[in-house]
């Protein structure tokens, strides 16, 4: 009976041990390795054909190492004012997150955030271009 209980507890603990640790994207823009740019048309949050190759590269970089996670940073320039641009940046990030999850990347390995030219000098300088989502695959801890 005791052995069965221990086996059961071990099985229940397995998924908890496999979960990705919480992470944040503060400073992700400063990293230079495993950074991918996914383009969008002006005013759009729909993925186009040009997104296919960088999305494949993101999935390859994430691989099966559950310690690797991705910061998905949506950008929008001055496309309709501050509120509209931050909303568009968030929609773009969410679109990429949904597409990656749809291709099998667990959502707990993805974090999407919006970046706005009003709050980010890098976006204001158009590096990366303001009509992109930047995906930064973080190194495993």
Say what each PLM segment does:
Residues 40, 72-75:
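Short loop/turn segments at strand-loop or loop-helix junctions that form parts
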Residues 68-70, 108:
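Short beta-strand/loop motifs in extracellular/secreted proteins, especially
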Residues 75-141:
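Periplasmic OmpA-like peptidoglycan-binding domain that tethers envelope proteins to the cell wall
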Residues 1-8:
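Sec-dependent signal peptide recognition
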Residues 17-68, 126, 139-141:
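Periplasmic peptidoglycan-binding/tethering modules of Gram-negative envelope proteins
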Residues 13-15:
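N-terminal signal peptide c-region/cleavage motif recognized by signal peptidases
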């Amino acid at each position: 009976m005791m052995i069965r209980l221990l086996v059961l507890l071990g099985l229940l603990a397995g998924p908890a041990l496999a979960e990705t640790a919480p992470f944040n994207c503060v400073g992700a823009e400063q990293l230079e390795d495993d950074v991918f740019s996914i383009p969008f048309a002006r005013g759009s949050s729909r993925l186009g054909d040009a997104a296919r190759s960088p999305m494949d590269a993101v999935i390859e970089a994430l691989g099966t190492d559950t310690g690797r996670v991705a910061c998905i940073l949506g950008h929008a320039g001055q496309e309709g004012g501050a509120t509209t641009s931050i909303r568009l940046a968030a929609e773009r990030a969410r679109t990429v997150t949904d597409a990656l999850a749809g291709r099998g990347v667990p959502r707990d390995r993805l974090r999407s955030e919006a970046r706005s030219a009003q709050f980010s000098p890098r976006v204001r300088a158009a590096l990366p271009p303001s009509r992109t989502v930047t995906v930064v695959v973080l190194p495993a801890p």
